[in-house]
Design a protein with these regions (language model features):
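Conserved GNAT acetyl-CoA-binding A-motif
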Residues: 134-144
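Conserved active-site tyrosine of GNAT-family acetyltransferases
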Residues: 155-156, 183
Length: 223
């Protein structure tokens, strides 16, 4: 295993904006509330919130969530903004931030109906991954989810994380016992993973209807 040199220190993430070709990640703010509440309560909300820590929000609970989330430094929330029209299509966060060890996790992901399973979702993840490895220089990027959450587990593998095991009876969430599946990505793995993302996200990989020509997962399987 080719470990990279360990730094003497790692910086904590800052509330900055990250811009891609289709989406931008910006610090979560009250101005994103209307769009986020609409997508949080749109058709299929029960499915989107099934494995999140929160329930489908009411106006009151959403207001309290936004107050806490906008002020939080860990998790550090961002809104996912579609550059085409400036709409907020989802949110995600960097969390379990551990500068002493150069370890960080992506989580609290809520991608709305217009964004989930699209090129925009892939780019939103990629922007955070680039920030974690290329800007902060962290050693380890984590993804974890309920072991029953099939879509999240498939997404982790598609994005290049490696499955590392299950913590049994790890949490109690919404009154139920949760076994947690853990996934990790390491700094020395990132350069090759990044190349596959860049090729997949390039305009040449999409036809006139916006459909992908090659799958991201197919490329990552060869690593």
């Amino acid at each position: 295993m080719n470990h990279l040199p360990i730094r003497s220190s790692y910086e904590a993430p800052l509330p900055i904006s990250l811009t891609g070709s289709a989406v931008a990640l910006v610090p979560l703010a009250a101005s994103h509330g209307d769009d986020l509440y609409a997508l949080s309560t749109a058709k299929g909300a029960e499915d989107r919130f099934r494995y999140l820590f929160e329930q489908v929000p009411t106006p009151e609970s959403f207001e309290q969530f936004m107050i806490k989330a906008c002020a939080s430094k860990d998790p550090m929330y961002v809104a996912v903004i579609r550059k085409e029209d400036g709409r907020c299509l989802g949110r995600q966060s960097l969390m379990r931030i551990t500068p002493d060890h150069g370890v960080i996790e992506i989580g609290n992901i809520l991608w709305g109906p217009d964004m989930a399973a699209t090129r925009m979702a892939t780019e939103a993840f990629f922007l955070h991954a680039c920030y974690v490895f290329d800007t902060l220089g962290y050693r380890r990027f984590e993804w974890k989810c309920n072991v029953l959450n099939g879509p999240s587990r498939r997404a982790a593998l598609r994005f290049g994380f490696r499955f590392e095991g299950v913590f049994r009876q790890h949490m109690i969430v919404k009154g139920k016992s949760r076994d947690t599946a853990w996934y990790g990505m390491l700094d020395h793995e990132w350069p090759q993973i990044k190349q596959h993302f860049e090729r997949w996200l390039s305009p040449e990989n999409f036809d006139g209807k916006g459909s992908q020509k090659t799958q991201l997962r197919a490329g990552l399987l060869s690593l």
